[in-house]
Structures are given as C-alpha cells and as structure tokens.
A protein has these predicted regions:
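A short glycine-rich, Lys/Arg-flanked "PGG" loop and its adjoining helix->strand segment in the class I
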Residues: 104-118
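Class I SAM-dependent methyltransferase SAM/SAH-binding core
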Residues: 35-81, 105
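Short catalytic micro-motifs in class I SAM-dependent methyltransferases
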Residues: 95-99
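Conserved class I S-adenosyl-L-methionine
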Residues: 1-37, 45, 60-65, 117-149, 171-178, 182, ...
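A conserved beta-strand element that flanks and buttresses the S-adenosyl-L-methionine
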Residues: 92
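Conserved Class I S-adenosyl-L-methionine
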Residues: 162-248
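Local beta-strand N-terminus motif with an aromatic residue
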Residues: 33, 88-89, 115
Length: 248
C-alpha cells in the first residue's frame, strides 16, 4: 500500500476531498466514541474534529499532504499497529482495507486496539451493476474482486456485524471510483483517474481501449441514450458499505 500511494498520492487531496454526506454517515457509525484511531488514514479525510483522533498512515507522500492542524499521525502499517490493546474507543478504516498486504492480520489489529467498535468503509465485491466497469472497464471488476474482502470475511473476523449501505450522491465531491456516476466525462480526465487506485493499477492496453469507447459513446450520444435514466436519480447504489463491529 505504501508504495502504491507513494506513486499515485501526489495531489491526492485535491480530488479526494471529504464528502459531507459520507462524513455524516461515518460520524453516525462511530456513535459516541471519544477516541478514534484512523488506520490507512491518507491525507486525513473524514477524521472527526469533535473527538480525539490518532492517524496511522504508511505512505510519506500522503502524510505530507495532511493539514498542519490535523490529527497527529504515526507512520506505520495496519498489520502492526504500535498501540496497546484497547487503546481507543473505536478504530476506523476508510476505503483502505483492500490495499493491505495481510488483510486478516490488519482486521485483527483493528479489533485489538478498539475497546468499543470497529468502523470500516469498504466496497462489496459481490455487488455488480456500475456502467463504468460493465461497459468500459470489466477488468477492474476482476481486479477488485481479488482484493476487496467480502462481507463474509468481515463476519469471520468480527462475528456479528452491522452492514449499512452508502448510496453515492450524484454530486459527490470525494473522487473515489463511483463518485462520477452521473458525470461520465470526468473519467476521461487523467487527474481524476490519478486519484483512483484501480486506474493506477490498470494495464495500458485495456485502459486505453476502455477510454476510447467511453470517449466515442459520449461524443455520439450512445452513453446518454443508454443511461438517460441516471439523470433522474440523486443518488445511486454502487456497492459501498459501512461495516460496524461491536467489541464490547
């Protein structure tokens, strides 16, 4: 993970800004947790300002983009958190677990350092139906299904969990993979793709082929004819999930 984000993390904070609706969903999931460790914290998006937070991030490129007045940050790996057992009320991991080299160990570490709950924002690899990957980049689905843990994986680690859906708003300002579902031209922008790890791992051959098809379909109206119904929707279910595991 550190190497990937040292490579793609330059300028990351300009595209990956916290969306207030996802921020509110995370705050609700954290409930009354007073102390939080944010693992795989990146540039610090979604770290609540109304409670004590410690960030953990392995990539120095991301650490350098954190706000000077942000939460204190420790350069470390999710696989070996440098904290005692039950050091925090809650542990938090936002769209990061799929990058961890040893997911089972990292999830166990999240549980070890939390005495209250574990909150994880992730994507369900068993979900399907996003036009971007179905029509243009099916290879991304194959890649993501190899790296994203399933809901059953979380259940095996934590036991009973609560799973909440996060439908993506049409004007989402956090530039993750599904953010631009109603703004298809955005995916043609190299700076947009640079902030999405799936594109960073793409093979040039299928990436260029998919971009060419998308560019053509947007130019001749094929995309709009096929997906006009999307403009009637303010949010879209794309498989993003918030996992909550109680440690009490």
């Amino acid at each position: 993970m550190s190497q990937l984000y040292d490579e793609i993390g330059v300028g990351y904070q300009h595209r990956r800004r916290p969306d207030p609706r996802l921020a509110a969903a995370i705050i609700r999931a954290l409930d009354d947790a007073e102390t939080v460790v944010n693992v795989g914290a990146g540039a610090g998006s979604y770290e609540p300002s109304d409670r004590s937070v410690v960030a953990v991030e392995p990539a120095m490129t991301m650490i350098r983009q954190r706000r000077p007045d942000g939460a204190p940050v420790v350069q470390a790996s999710a696989n070996d958190l440098p904290f005692r057992d039950e050091a925090f009320t809650a542990s938090l991991a936002i769209l990061t677990v799929h990058h961890w080299p040893d997911q089972a160990r990292g999830l166990a570490e999240l549980a070890r350092v939390a005495r209250g709950r574990v909150v994880i924002v992730t994507w369900d690899p068993l979900w399907s139906g996003f036009w971007l990957v179905d029509d243009y980049f099916p290879e991304i689905t194959d890649l993501d299904r190899q790296i994203f843990p399933t809901i059953e994986d979380f259940q095996r680690t934590f036991g009973r969990i609560e799973v909440r859906s996060f439908p993506v708003p049409h004007d989402c300002i956090d530039g993750f993979m599904g953010a631009y579902w109603r703004r298809p031209h955005a995916y043609l922008d190299p700076s947009v793709r640079a902030a999405i790890s799936a594109f960073a791992k793409a093979e040039p051959s299928w990436l260029e082929s998919g971009l060419a098809r998308l560019r053509r379909d947007l130019a001749d109206g094929t995309w709009e004819r096929r997906h006009a119904h999307l403009f009637e929707q303010s949010e879209l279910e794309l498989g993003y999930r918030i996992i909550i595991a109680e440690r009490d």
